[in-house]
Structures are given as C-alpha cells and as structure tokens.
Amino acid sequence: MGDTIKELLNPTVLSALLMGFAFSMVLGPIFIPMLHKLKFGQNIRTDGPKSHLKKSGTPTMGGLIFFISVSVTMLIIEYKPTDEGMIVLYSLIAFGIIGFLDDILKIIHRDNLGLRAYQKMILLLLFSIALAYYGYTNIGTDIIIPFMNSKLNLGIFYIPLVVVYYAATTNAVNLTDGIDGLASSVTVIVLTFFAIVGFKTGHYQVGVFSIALAGALLGFLRYNAFPAKIFMGDTGSLALGGAIATIALILKMPLFIIIVGGIYVVETLSVIIQVTSFKTTGKRVFKMAPIHHHFEQCGWSEVKLVTVFSIITLILCIIGFIAL
C-alpha cells in the first residue's frame, strides 16, 4: 500500500491530475459560449421529467472538454503510441467519435434521434472487435474473478464476450448521464479506483491515464454540476464508457465493473425491467426509467441524487478493493 501511495504522489501522476483539471477549467468558458453561438443545444424529451424541460437549449457535446483535456495531457506526458495508457486514449477517442456523430445528427434534426440503431451498432461493433482483438493478442484471455483470488480463462469465447462487454459498458454509462453531474461524479470515483489498482498491479500507464481523466472530469464538473451550464452529451458518455471498459480490460478486471460500477448496472437494469414489464404486462415497475428519474419523480433533488449515488459508488469501490 505504501508503494501505491508513493505512486499517487509521483510528480508525473500529480501533473496528470492537475493538467487534466486545469485544461477542463480553461476550456469550459471557451466551449460554453461557442456552443451557444452555434446553437448546439440539448433537445429535451417531452416524456421525461417536467423539471428538465427548462434545460432545453443547454449546450451539449461538452464531452469534448474532457476529451481534449485528457488527450493533450497524455501528449504532454509523451507516452509512446503503443503504451497501455495510449490504448485507453484510443478507445476514448473511438467511442467519443460515435457519440460526436450521434450528437451532431440530433442537433441537425432538432430531435433526440441521432444515429440510427443499426448505424450505432455497426460502429460499436467495429471498435469493440478491434479492442477485443488487441486484448486477445496482447493482454491474454484470462480475467480476475472477484472475491475468489483466481482467474478464469475465456479462451475462444474471449472476443465475442468482450464485444458484448463493450456494448454493455458504453450504453450503461450513457444511461447514467441523465441528470446534472451524475455520470461525471460517479465516473471520477470509478476511475480513482482503477487508478489505484493500476499502480498497485504495475500498470503505471493505465493509472496515470485514469488519474488524468479523473482530473479532467473534476474540472468539467465545475460546469456540469447542478445547475449544469453544459451537458457532456453522447460525445462524453460513450467516450467514458469506452475508456472505462478498456481500463478494466487491461487490468483483467471487466467483472469488477459490475461491483464498482454498480450504479451503471442498476441504471441499465431499471430500463430493461421497465421495458420488459410494460411490453409483457402493460404496467410500469418504476415511475420513470432510468432509475434516477424514478427518484426524481419521488421528490429527490438532482443534488441529492448525485450525492447519494456518489456515496454508494464510493462504498462499492471499497467492496471492490476487498474483492481483489
């Protein structure tokens, strides 16, 4: 543990954290008025919480802020193109591009219909297969089983399972991004968990990237926390999902996302349960899905929701350390 703390206090690590944070803080006041001027505003669903309707027109695609911040930070740190940290950066960019295209089309069409489902699926499959192949050839097909102190070799099933894993993780983070600051806050904690594990297990570059992205998200939160001046959009949420999935994959810990990313999982399950129940019985289990909207309908404020979900994530990350 002492060595891990030393790594966290390493000048390079601290520089990555501070640079990511500083770049986001600087870019926020540049991007927000620029996106306003371009009329890149969020279209709010009329079937969502009524309190959200006043947010219509809030600049979206804010993921570009931490997207650029962490990219510049990693370039300044001067990692080689084949380093693990850069592989995570590539995945952030790849899935961020999908989100960017989705956001742009939503803005052009002035509705919530961006990329068609099949178009998004094709792009997700292409990037997921490429990353799964990278994992198969460079990382190995074994993954750590939580609480068991053992590994499971996926063998020939590795690539198809990893492709499904990427689709699930990116969409789960996307669903979590439904209220001001929620996805950002939860993901900062998850990234910190993986950064510590990265340093502890010798994956220094992954640890540095995780810290840099956490710093960039903290800077972004200055503008994304309630009341949000900017939304991350699919540009941000899909990029974050792709990055987290790759970080966990390199650490051989994809199963740990079920634990430390428990909020992502619950958000996704709430949608699946709601849709399944309505289609089979005509009844809804929740007042609204994803589940953060259910709690909003129950009278919870966005600030309370973000605080409670963040505390839960912190507890889940502690459980994650126990599961190692």
UniProtKB/Swiss-Prot annotation:
Pathway listed: Cell wall biogenesis; peptidoglycan biosynthesis
Top-rank taxon: Bacteria
GO cellular component: plasma membrane
Subcellular location: Cell membrane
Keywords: Cell cycle, Cell division, Cell membrane, Cell shape, Cell wall biogenesis/degradation, Magnesium, Membrane, Metal-binding, Peptidoglycan synthesis, Transferase, Transmembrane, Transmembrane helix
Root EC class: transferase
Entry-linked Pfam families: Glycos_transf_4, MraY_sig1
PROSITE patterns tied to this protein: MRAY_1, MRAY_2
UniProt-listed InterPro entries: Glycosyl_transferase_4, PNAcMuramoyl-5peptid_Trfase, PNAcMuramoyl-5peptid_Trfase_CS
MF annotations from Gene Ontology: metal ion binding; phospho-N-acetylmuramoyl-pentapeptide-transferase activity; UDP-N-acetylmuramoyl-L-alanyl-D-glutamyl-meso-2,6-diaminopimelyl-D-alanyl-D-alanine:undecaprenyl-phosphate transferase activity
Membrane topology: Multi-pass membrane protein
Entry's Gene Ontology BP terms: cell division; cell wall organization; peptidoglycan biosynthetic process; regulation of cell shape
E.C. numbers: 2.7.8.13
Function statement: Catalyzes the initial step of the lipid cycle reactions in the biosynthesis of the cell wall peptidoglycan: transfers peptidoglycan precursor phospho-MurNAc-pentapeptide from UDP-MurNAc-pentapeptide onto the lipid carrier undecaprenyl phosphate, yielding undecaprenyl-pyrophosphoryl-MurNAc-pentapeptide, known as lipid I.
The protein's name: Phospho-N-acetylmuramoyl-pentapeptide-transferase
Source organism of this protein record: Clostridium botulinum (strain Eklund 17B / Type B)
Gene (UniProt): mraY
